[in-house]
Amino acid sequence: MSVGALETAPSFESRRRVVGAKLGRYQVGPRIGVGGSAAVYLARTTGPMSSEEFVAIKVVHEHLSEEEEFISQFRDEANLLVRVAHPNIVRVKELGRENDTLFLAMEYLHGQPLSKLASTLARRGAHLDSVLVAWLGARVAEGLAYAHELTDDQSEPLALVHRDVSPQNVFVTYQGEVKLIDFGIARAAGRIVQTTLGRVKGKF
């Protein structure tokens, strides 16, 4: 999986086929997660000028694609998140739209969320070493510090806040990287979270 805690939700593919489709320069593969506002798919870049690369594609559910307020906030937040470039935060590559399908292309992470690693160890009667936990926490703190200090082109703070820094949103890759995931969720618990200009709020 490549993005945070994705809860089970009804499939939206009955009316719109996504698997096998081409969204922009991406060929969409299998679905790897689904949440309340979007589903996530494994995809790869295509085209003669593109080096083949696997990415995670977050596709907004069809019923939300028709909500003007949601789409406006989604675009604003995506455009801010594209600016974020830090080794301890998942990289958002681009926001795109193909016909009526709105999507976000992100770095694909091959690994497991920290919550799953901890639960796997617990089932085996083990636990994460305290030194390792401290190291993981330091990497998360570095990512958060960068996000909190990020500014726009006028050097004004963007006030990017995660608000759900939890084990399911800390991803550890098989290469030993530590990545914060699931920034910028604007819709939660069936409501629109109001944001002010230049401010992104995470999950509540």
Q: Residues of each region from the PLM?
A:
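Activation-segment/catalytic-loop signature of the eukaryotic protein kinase fold
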Residues: 95
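Protein kinase glycine-rich loop
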Residues: 28-35, 40
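Activation segment signature within eukaryotic-like protein kinase domains
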Residues: 136-137
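Protein kinase catalytic-loop region centered on the HRD/HxD motif
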Residues: 142-160
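AlphaC helix of the eukaryotic protein kinase fold
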Residues: 61-83
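AlphaC helix of the protein kinase catalytic domain
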Residues: 114-128
